[in-house]
Regions:
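Conserved catalytic network of the ASCE P-loop NTPase/AAA+ motor domain
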Residues: 77-78, 113-115, 147-150
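Post-Walker A helix-loop "phosphate-sensing" segment adjacent to the P-loop in P-loop NTPases
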Residues: 103-120
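Conserved nucleotide-sensing/catalytic segment adjacent to the nucleotide-binding pocket
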Residues: 130-157
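Walker A/P-loop nucleotide-binding motif
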Residues: 80-100
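Residue-level preference for the first positions of well-ordered beta-strands
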Residues: 81-85, 119-120, 154
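A short hydrophobic beta-strand->loop->alpha-helix junction that borders the nucleotide-binding pocket
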Residues: 117-133
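A short, basic N-terminal segment
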Residues: 1-72
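Phosphate-binding P-loop
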Residues: 72-82
Length: 157
């Protein structure tokens, strides 16, 4: 269950907000509230809840530029119902980081006027399939998660 807790030091926008460290930076900040709710309902792991700077290798530069352009135009990408499959045989080369960058960018574009609705999901396919399997033998909240998939705008698998 979602519980709102304001912490200005954990604000996603403190580096760009003119109200940070002023008396206007307080628990009633709608931007913080909405973004906090979007992050919570998306299930993005804590380690990915803040955007990380990536530096492309020369062999990945074209892919990096493509993904960066897509991130900059995430609203139109989502509105068009597009899909993207980021894959590699290797670990640690930024696939998950890029996926969460898309979610974070999307959330930063749509928070105003969102009305505290879930708008994106970060799903570990392995964990989802395991939860579905477990649901056959016990009660768990996998159905709540499955019900969200067709409702939100953006799903990262």
């Amino acid at each position: 269950m979602y519980e709102y807790k304001f912490d200005r030091e954990k604000c996603w926008f403190k580096d760009v907000c003119g109200k940070y460290k002023t008396t206007d930076c307080c628990a009633s900040c709608l931007r913080f509230m909405e973004f906090d709710f979007l992050i919570y309902t998306s299930r993005i792991p804590k380690v990915y809840q803040k955007s990380v700077n990536l530096k492309p290798d020369s062999c990945d530069y074209n892919s990096f530029e493509y993904l960066n352009d897509l991130k900059q135009d995430i609203i139109n990408f989502v509105a068009a119902g597009e899909n993207l499959f980021i894959h590699s045989c290797f670990t640690g080369n930024g696939k998950t980081t890029w996926a969460t960058k898309f979610l974070l960018r999307y959330f930063s574009e749509i928070w105003l006027g969102n009305g505290f609705k879930p708008r994106g999901l970060f799903l570990s396919t392995q964990n989802l399939l395991f939860s579905i399997k477990q649901s056959f033998n016990s009660a768990n909240n996998v159905q709540d998660l499955l019900d969200l998939i067709p409702v939100v705008d953006l799903v990262v698998w």
